[in-house]
Structures are given as C-alpha cells and as structure tokens.
Amino acid sequence: RQSKGAYLLKDTLPTDPTGRDRMILDLYGSPDARQINGIGGADPLTSKVAIVNLSDRDDADIDYTFGYVGIADAVVDYEGNCGNISAGAGVFAIMEGFVKAVEPETVVRIFNTNTNKVIEAHVPVRDGKPVIDGDFAIDGVPGTGARITLYFLEPGGSKTGKLLPTGNVQDTITLADGRTIQVSLVDAANPAVFVKATDLGYEGTELPAFTETDGGVLLNTLEYIRTTAAVMMGLAPSKEAASPAVPKVCMVSAPQTYLASDGRTIEGNSIDIVARTKALAVMHKAYAVTGGICTATAALITGTVANEVVSERAKETSRVTLAHPSGKFDFEICLTNDTGWHVEKAGVARTARPIMKGIAYVKGE
C-alpha cells in the first residue's frame, strides 16, 4: 500500500483508446495540478489506475493493465507496470469473483498487459474473502495489513525483450555539462537506468525534500540520464519522446546508516543497498516495487554499477534489502547465469485493502 488507485472493469470503459483515456482523465480530475474535480490525489503515487478483465490465457486468471494518470498533463501512460497496484489486482479479482476463493491462500495469476508478463499474487483468504487485516508492516505505509506475496515470473526484458538491453553491464553517458558517467541499463519487471550517487556528487541518502532546496539540479540531472537511457534502450526515438514513467532512473549507493523521512535510524548493517528514484517529475517518497525488483536484480548481476555497491551478503544469499527514503524492503531474486543472465522469478511482499466500491460520475453522464 505505497500507492492508491481505482480498479476499473474493462467492459465498463469505451473500447476506443482515446475515449477510454478521456473518461479516466475526467474521473481523476486531470489535467489539473490539484485534481480538484476528480478522485486523484494530486500525487504520482495516488494518480494510478488499473483496468481488469477475465483472461482467456491458459496461464492467467485475469488481464490487468496499469496506467499512470497524468496530473497536470492530459495523458494516461501505460508504458510500465506498478507492483503495488499489482497486489491490489489480486484482491480485486477475488472480490469480483473472477477467481474462486481458496483458504487459507488463493493464488491469482495476473497477466500484466503492459509488460506481457505473468505475476502470481498469493492472497490470504478467510470465509471466502481476502484477508485485509494483519501484522505485516511496510515502511512508508501507516499501519499494518495481511501479507500478500507477489512473484514476478520471468520478469526480464519486460519492455525491451532483454535483461541487459544494450548487451553491456555498464555503458557511458555524457551529461549536459560534459561530464561522463558510468551507468547500467537493466530491464526486469520494468526497465531502469542505474547510476552511482557518488559519481553525481551525492551521498545517496538524500531525502525527497532535498530537491526543494537545490534549484532542481538533482531532478534535472536524473531526468537527463533517464531520457538518454530511454533512447539507448530503444524505448524512444529521442529524449523528447521518452515516456515520463519508463524507464525508471535509480541512484544507488553502498549500505550506510541514515535517517529516514520519519526520523528513524536505518542501520547500515541491516541493509544491502541504498537507492533513490523518481516518481514522474518528483523524487519518490519511498520506492517503486517494480523498480525495486529491477534494482535488486541489477545488484546481483556481476559488473553493474549496482553490483559494485551492494553488500557481499546479498551476493551470497540472492536476498536484497533495499533502503529508500521511508525505510527498507526485501526482495528475493532467482537469478541464473548458465548461458547468460536470466531471472526465473522475483518475490516481494506487499499489502492491499479495498477502500470503497461505488459509482463515479464523469462528464456526459
């Protein structure tokens, strides 16, 4: 629950993509920086949508499409997936009767149309309904909930078709000021570009509020790297044409002790890598799940910039504890290198709960 979004049945939306997106934008109150005339929360983490329908695939129960709903811009971006919203899709499928509830745990097979990948959501069930309450805590999310384990199956090459889109573990990017930096381009669950914080002159433990006082330098630098990487990965013909959501850009650093956004001390010996990422035009207050899977995967691929800063413990166990502005979370990566790097699956735990079910009114209705 580091995200919030509406789950819409595909057959209730216009079949025409333009009409569909217009309806979703109206529903969220976009374009408007405050989304005052809709259900959007004026934050990238709350301006998300899921479109769901029964799947006709043998390996999936539901088809699920994720969209980033523009806030100030009249656009719905479908280029990538969201792990948090994926967890909610499993709960939604059981609530809607798309999947028969099986106690004590129901496995919902989700085909994500954004990445053409299957995700297994292991949802706890009691009395025929998803269990919502529990003692599993996620840093950055108030309270606790029932643990939902997500397994992203064969997540490599989600958008580019390759785990290493350029075939290299490191590439070089020349920044606008002429500096050259080493980056790693990896595509697992979502494509991302990784850069060391120290190579940009940062500690790596900076909190989102830092960008309010630096004149936009960090955000602009990361966006330059991100859009340059989009072209290098074949995701866009030019920097200007790059999706605002994909690829992710991630700034990584070695394990170190720091203060989280809520003032808690995150001990360096309890984590394996420190990372910061963007959420559209601002710094992420926590960390994207799909971006975390890609980060954990990159950290275990020998020779990447993330691998150069991750703990030796993570390399030995294939379990990566990633530290972000709000705290930390854990990933389990099943990675092989028999005839080249290959990710069999990636596991992460989330929570999800329904807030309401009802009717929303859009223009013309």
Which residues make up each language-model segment?
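A glycine-rich beta-to-alpha transition motif near the start of alpha/beta enzyme domains, typified by
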Residues: Q2-E365
